Every structure is written in C-alpha cells, then in structure tokens.
Amino acid sequence: MTDRLPGFSTLAVHAGAQPDPTTGARVTPIYQTTSFVFNDADHAASLFGLQAFGNIYTRIGNPTTAVLEERIAALEGGTAALAVASGHAAQVVVLQQLLMPGDEFIAARKLYGGSINQFTHAFKSFGWNVAWADPDDIGSFERAVTPRTKAIFIESIANPAGSITDIEAIAEVARKAGVPLIVDNTLATDRKSVV
C-alpha cells in the first residue's frame, strides 16, 4: 500500500461510505425511512437536545444523506457539507445564518427567476432586503454595499441567460466589504469546467 491520498474519481465513488458490517455490501443503501428507533427516552432526549449525535428524523438527516454530505465535502476539500431538498432551501439555510430582520444582501440581477421571486417577495417576510447589482458592472456591487450588507449572492453561470459571472472580481468586492460571497453553481457541469 502507498500513503497516497485518494484522487477525485476515488472520492467521487467511495468518500463517506463504509461497507455494511452485516451484509458486506459496498454501496450505501437508500434508507427509505422517516424515523429511527431510540434506545430509550433518555437516548431520544439526548438526540433531540443535540447532546448526542445520531439519526432523529430523515428531514434532519439520515445515513444516505450523511454519505452524500461527506462525499461532497471530500470532493470539494471542505470540512463538512449540508444537503438540502432544493436550491431555494439552500438559499434560506445560508441566509438565515447571516441575516437578521433589517439586514440586506446584494444579489446579481441575472439570476434564476425563482430566486428573483424568492428574494423580492418571500424574503420580505423575514425582514430581509435585497439590493440588486449588475454582474456586467462590478462597480454596481461596490456601490450597493451599505453598513447593513451581510452577503453578496451570484450565480456562476446566470440561469437562463448563460452569461458567465466574474466570480473573482465580485469576490474581491465581498472581501473589501467583509461579507461572504454566496455562489449558486447550479449550471456548472463538472470540476474541470472553466468558468
């Protein structure tokens, strides 16, 4: 054996997975369950109280999802990943960690229509404000930054226009503003794509 780290292809197939100890099956099964068994009431209380790690309810996580998350983290060179049911759910999860009522974020004008609707209408109920910027005019992002700006949101490839966003230039605006840059990478094909 060598001490060589697994490559991208190996990680894509095996990261996060362990052979089943009972059957020896190599592939992670799809766990089609919503709920899990607890050892007793104290065990359940410790799980729901986030004092112990384990499966509680599939909406929160399950063994199949855990393997997906570990695999994505390994492929991206990250510490962890979080799988959610949709892109809109991902937007909510990320922005809920960054924004409070009255805060704002900057978004590129060239976005998927569903995102534009969510940002313009649904997020108002959270008290979040969106400032729109033109991805073809990097200065518009700089001009949109205010003391209430908590994040910048773009798509790597605008949907449906297909225009390529200058991620590096907008990342520099975000760095100068001291806010995270959130990049929706839905339309990119693979890790070797040139964006």
PLM features: residue spans?
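N-terminal "arm"/small-domain region of PLP-dependent enzymes with the aminotransferase-like
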Residues: 2-62, 70-71
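Conserved PLP-enzyme active-site core in the AAT-like
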Residues: 2-4, 12-14, 18-21, 81-195
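Conserved N-terminal alpha-helix of the aminotransferase class I/II PLP-enzyme fold
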Residues: 40-92, 114-121
